Regions:
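N-terminal secretory targeting modules
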Residues: 1-25, 70-72
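A general structural motif
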Residues: 23, 72-76, 214-216, 251
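Well-ordered, non-membrane alpha-helical segments in soluble/globular domains
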Residues: 61-64, 196-204, 234-244
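Short beta-alpha junction loops
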Residues: 81-85, 223-226, 260
Length: 295
């Protein structure tokens, strides 16, 4: 429920008091796609992976605003771009609870229901019915996915071809339900169009923050397996991914690996149809650093 209870992933006040490291070369932001795309362990670079599963763009922005002090001048901020980064998502109590244990000053990472989240974090017995239901759903998901939690640590794909095909269909079906999409090639619904406008401005704010503080923002589109990528039609990609970045209207380097067959066609670099496994993350991270010219 709470992220970074050991204060090792994010440089909050506890981390800063326990570590002397500063002048980091790079941080990456993002949701699940970023969390399972980058792994800097064993690489001669000072970098942090600030992505979480899940994590909104607003939370990305606020994490950067709170913790950017560890970056060196000219440091890179990798912004992971996923299929629906350009659409807004509803947040709830569990989103606010994720960051309730952070030791930060100023605005919270997730302002929505922040005071409630703080109260519940301190006094769980006060959980209301709504919060208790959310907690039960969360814990049930954790209980039934012990094997799933181990999968990202594998260096191979535990799924066979048929399982990968079914997994890809589940992702597509889930996204359609989450964002109210019937046809992925159709125009945006009014609700998604409004969410797009919000996300455009939010991304502009994030990019502008980077440039104003002397950092180098970079869009990164990680690869997915062919089992999932085949559902991303040119119309879909233009409308939901590239069109969104164009509408943001900022001059930002784009590293796009969605068509890189070295990753896309090798199922054994993933732990499902979507996310890179331990070996895949290592290879992908080295590739990104090489393309940035910093490793």
């Amino acid at each position: 429920m709470f992220v970074d209870l050991a204060h090792e992933t994010y440089p909050d006040k506890v981390w800063l008091g326990a570590h002397e490291e500063r002048d980091f070369d790079l941080v990456n932001l993002g949701s699940s796609g970023g969390k399972w795309a980058f792994d800097y362990t064993g690489i001669d670079i000072k970098a942090m992976n600030w992505a979480q599963q899940p994590q909104t763009l607003l939370e990305d922005y606020n994490l950067l605003r709170h913790f950017h002090c560890i970056l060196k001048p000219g440091g890179y901020v990798l912004i992971t771009i996923m299929p629906f980064t350009g659409l807004n998502k509803n947040t709830g109590l569990m989103d606010a609870m994720k960051y309730a244990k952070f030791d930060v000053q100023g605005d919270p990472i997730q302002p929505y229901m922040f005071e409630e989240a703080q109260r519940y974090a301190a006094y769980p017995i006060l959980f209301k019915k709504q919060a208790l239901k959310a907690l039960i759903r969360y814990l049930m998901g954790k209980d039934k996915s012990c094997d799933t939690e181990r999968r990202p640590l594998l260096d191979h794909n535990p799924m066979d071809v048929n399982e990968l095909e079914r997994d890809a269909k589940r992702w597509i079906s889930g996204w359609k339900k989450q964002f109210g999409i019937d046809d992925m090639d159709a125009a945006l619904t009014e609700e998604n169009r409004q969410g797009r406008e919000y996300r455009i401005q939010l991304m502009r704010n994030l990019i502008d923050f980077c440039t104003e503080h002397g950092y180098k923002p970079v869009y990164v589109i990680p690869p997915v397996t062919e089992h999932l990528a085949k559902y991303y039609t040119p119309q879909f990609e233009e409308r939901y991914i590239y069109g969104y970045l164009k509408d943001v209207g900022r001059d930002v380097m784009l590293l796009d690996y969605s068509k890189d067959d070295r990753f896309r066609l090798d199922d054994n670099l993933y732990f499902n149809s979507f996310f890179l496994n331990k070996r895949g993350r290592k290879l992908f991270t080295k590739r990104v650093l090489k393309d940035l010219g910093i490793h």
